[in-house]
Amino acid sequence: MPQNKVLSFPLPEGTLLEDITKNKWILGKQLGSGGFGLVYQVSCKSKEIDCVAKIELKESGGLFCEINFYNRVMKNKTSLDTWMKEQKIDYIGIPSFHGFGITIYKNVEYRFAIIQRLGRDLENILSEKEKFNITVIKKLAIKILDILKFIHSKEFSHGDIKAGNILFGKDDDKVYLVDYGLATKYSSNGKHKEYTINPKNRHNGTMAFTSIDAHKGVTVSRRGDLESLGFCMLKWYSGKLPWEKYEKEPENVQGMKEAFVNNISKKTIPFKNAGIIYNYIKVVTKLEYEEAPNYESLKQMFL
């Protein structure tokens, strides 16, 4: 995986970006930062569209991976429409992708991607509420499982499921999963990657929610994304995770997660009304590395 480097300085408001299809975009105010890049409000010179620009140093790896994901997964509108019809859903919870390119500022090359602008993320909401009730978590789980089913059908895993990467649309009924900087092909043309430990990739992702496979340096497969979602739901419901205070000790976090899933019971999740989360984590952590999950069965747990 390409290495990320921190953006040296922000690009000024008003900077003109030209993507590979010659569409021109004008940077507005900086909206935030994530990972190793910056996020800006952006406007298109030729059409009215509400987007953001994600910008990183050209040699950074995250945005390169994200652009690759969008180009492979989100470009074929016919395929997207067919999927929605087959699944009986009215949207796919992945931001629309509008362009990408390279720009130069002060003799430094930057990579950029133009992506649909969304609303608030769950992390922001949790900073005010601390916890979600089980009704909210059920609704979120169903929507995120729909998104993961689609991503996994394209032979990609997300690799970084967390509240900060889950956003509401302008319509609060719509939920989106963002940030595909760690998205990985777990399979190619139907041939699943073998379970192989790569020490260089150990502990990738966000420590509190990283799957056990990712802790070991194994490519995240479908079960890894589902496991991370389980850890997220536990955090959203209880307000804490047993390993939270050890996040700077990845080996310790890994050991605690392994002990947790190997001995999972209602005693290890001692929160009232958390039985659904308990059952979900129990099911997904028993999946084999290459096993295709039954997404509809998982969704039924939350209905």
From Swiss-Prot:
Annotated keywords: ATP-binding, Kinase, Nucleotide-binding, Serine/threonine-protein kinase, Transferase
Transmembrane parts of this sequence: none
Gene3D superfamilies associated with the record: Transferase(Phosphotransferase) domain 1
Gene Ontology molecular function, alphabetical: ATP binding; protein serine kinase activity; protein serine/threonine kinase activity
Record InterPro entries: CK1_Ser-Thr_kinase, Kinase-like_dom_sf, Prot_kinase_dom, Protein_kinase_ATP_BS, Ser/Thr_kinase_AS
Leading EC class: transferase
Stated family: Belongs to the protein kinase superfamily. Ser/Thr protein kinase family. Poxviruses subfamily.
Name of the protein: Probable serine/threonine-protein kinase FPV212
Organism of origin: Fowlpox virus (strain NVSL)
Residues at the active site: 160
